């Protein structure tokens, strides 16, 4: 057994040295080494998760084609379970209770089904759209990044999928750069919302058939934390959203906001409720 390993490593080492000297150490060579190790492990009947040629000298790891990744779907005994998220591949074998055949998340194994992490669709897989995330909402992009962080923390990173997010050399594609740009925009927007909520806490709200929707402010409305002021209810609009939320505006800013629909932060805007007195502590409206 160990003699065979030494023979394999010696062969691999000589191959890599020759490739480096010849200036041709590219993806094809790494893929060749991985296939050789796979074949050896299959013949030896050992656990294919042993990291022999799977380890790369950089943070790229192994480059998988979609077809190669599909081999790690749990159908072949002895192979580990791999899934991809946003083009990154993780070994989820230790979570076999969740990712094994017939289990809840087996749908994700052997493929990149990033969109399903958001949609919750574990039945339909379309390889043309399964990892096309650019049409998702900003909060969903943040959610996907959170899932990726989870896998990086709790599971073993194995490499990258050649396709939408990474090219044949493992470099980020134009699509991936666009995703990162949209993700940063989403995070900026979320930070703005959090700052707005801290500056203008939410209102209490209730509905009745008789009076419609009632909104009002108290010293704990919004996040439930005690503050020194009560505030007055106003409609808070955010960028690209026709709907509004109720926000409590402090006395010191009330006149300035009502004078011209003051932009409170970025593209957010505060406006008074119709048919409600400027300094009323509660307002009523019907949708």
UniProtKB/Swiss-Prot annotation:
This protein's UniProt keywords: Coiled coil, Secreted, Signal
InterPro entries: Cyt_B5-like_heme/steroid-bd (IPR001199), Cyt_B5-like_heme/steroid_sf (IPR036400), MAPR/NEUFC/NENF-like (IPR050577)
Residue span, Cytochrome b5 heme-binding domain: 61-146
Keyword Coiled coil part of the UniProt annotation: yes
GO cellular component, one term: membrane
Signal sequence coordinates: 1-22
Coiled coil regions in record: 175-204
One Pfam family cited in the UniProt record for this chain: Cyt-b5
Source organism superkingdom: Eukaryota
Subcellular location: Secreted
Role according to the record: Heme-binding protein.
Domain description: The cytochrome b5 heme-binding domain was proven to bind heme, although it lacks the conserved iron-binding His residues at position 99 and 126.
PANTHER family recorded: MEMBRANE-ASSOCIATED PROGESTERONE RECEPTOR COMPONENT-RELATED, NEUFERRICIN
Family indicated by similarity: Belongs to the cytochrome b5 family. MAPR subfamily.
Record-given protein name: Neuferricin homolog
Native source species: Drosophila melanogaster (Fruit fly)
